[in-house]
Amino acid sequence: GLLDGLLGTLGL
């Protein structure tokens, strides 16, 4: 997700 910065695909 955006917050995790790892996947960046969840947008969470």
From Swiss-Prot:
Chain coiled-coil ranges? none
Query: What main location does UniProt list?
Result: secreted
Superkingdom of this entry's organism?
A: Eukaryota
On tissue specificity, the annotation reads:
Expressed by the skin dorsal glands.
User: GO biological process annotations for this chain's record?
Assistant: defense response
Q: Where is it located?
A: Secreted
Q: Cellular component per GO?
A: extracellular region
According to its UniProt record, how is this protein modified after translation?
Isomerization alpha-beta of the Asp-4 residue in caeridin 1.2; a cyclic succinimide may be formed between Asp-4 and Gly-5 residues in caeridin 1.3.
Positions of modified residues (Leucine amide): 12
Q: Which UniProt keywords apply?
A: Amidation, Amphibian defense peptide, Secreted
Q: What does this protein do?
A: Caeridins show neither neuropeptide activity nor antibiotic activity.
What name does the UniProt record give this protein? Caeridin-1.1/1.2/1.3
The species this protein was found in: Ranoidea xanthomera (Northern orange-eyed tree frog)
